[in-house]
Design a protein with these regions (language model features):
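Conserved N-terminal catalytic core of the sugar/cofactor nucleotidyltransferase
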Residues: 4-83, 93
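Short glycine-rich anion-binding loops that position phosphate/pyrophosphate groups of nucleotides
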Residues: 32, 61-62, 85-88, 108, ...
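Short coil/turn connectors at secondary-structure junctions
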Residues: 52, 76-79, 98-101, 184-185
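Conserved core of the sugar-phosphate nucleotidyltransferase
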Residues: 88-164
Length: 282
């Protein structure tokens, strides 16, 4: 979205605000048939550009977030951020030194659709409930977590994944977190200024528009100098990638056009056009 792959945008955002060097980035990918060597090479280079080592792990069976984390069990050591790859944020991810872990949350209008946390007066999380049928809290878990010693979560999840699953059940990170809370580990809540989901096409388009606006306000260059505009109007904010060619078209707002893409005789708003694509008379 907004010219950057979602997972790269997420890691960049985290790296930019945690104020600590990142030594290693572990990517949990699915079946190689869908996440092949080209993707692995791209992610490896991306991590190296951050000055970090890249590690690739596979979750071949979609058995939940807790199971996904345990796919990378061999490197679960020390201070670690866990983040879901369909989430983008704007936040100060400063870490509370008194906390064993931090869960970032955002107020939402429909908390029954999310996992939510309850806090006490000291901003300590005292309960975590997944998709409550009755009102518990409006602070939704956004899918970014910090663990001072992720070995503790690993040990908890090792016990979780020993359990047999009933049909439709999964191993969830929440099970490990609740076990840690029972051990007396202190979880604090972190707040985000903006939380943007990329879990389905509709919300991804909304996220694209929001990220374009953020980048515009932050002064980022959104139109590559090599892009060619012929008899066309660009209504910002829009992203236009390297080598793209736009002719006889009106583009924007909220449009991202990938590298090498050709747009002809089109009117586009709130759209995502991938690299090396071609659109005519839309």
């Amino acid at each position: 979205v907004a010219g950057t792959p979602i997972v790269e945008q997420l890691v960049n955002d985290i790296a930019g605000v945690v104020n600590q060097p990142i030594e290693e980035v572990a990517f949990i990918l699915g079946d190689p048939a869908f996440f092949g060597q080209e993707i692995v090479a791209h992610l490896t280079k991306f991590a190296e550009n951050l000055g970090a080592k890249a590690s690739i792990y596979r979750q071949l069976n979609p058995l939940g977030t807790g199971h996904a984390i345990m796919c990378a069990a061999s490197i679960l050591e020390g201070p670690t951020v866990v983040a879901y790859a369909d989430t983008l944020i704007r936040a100060d991810l400063s870490l509370d030194p008194t906390a064993d872990a931090v869960i970032w949350v955002k107020e939402v209008e429909q908390p029954e659709a999310f996992g939510v946390v309850q806090l006490n007066e000291e901003n300590t999380i005292v309960n975590l409930v997944e998709k409550p049928k009755e009102f518990v809290s409006d602070l939704a878990v956004i899918g970014i977590y910090y663990f001072k010693e992720i070995e503790v979560l690993k040990a908890a999840l090792q016990e979780v994944v020993k359990q047999s699953l009933q049909e439709g059940e999964e191993y969830q990170i929440n099970q490990g977190i609740l076990a840690m809370m029972e051990q007396g580990k202190v979880f604090k809540a972190g707040k985000v200024n903006a939380w943007m989901d990329c879990g389905n096409p509709e919300v991804t388009l909304q996220t694209n528009a929001a990220m374009l606006q953020f980048k515009k306000e932050e002064g980022e260059t959104l139109v590559d100098p090599s892009a060619i505009m012929e008899n066309s109007t660009l209504i910002p904010p829009c992203f236009v990638g390297k080598g793209a060619r736009i002719s006889n078209s009106t583009i924007g707002p909220g449009v991202s056009i990938g590298e090498g893409t050709i747009i002809e005789n089109c009117e586009l708003q709130n759209s995502l056009i991938q690299n090396q694509d071609r659109k005519s008379v839309v």
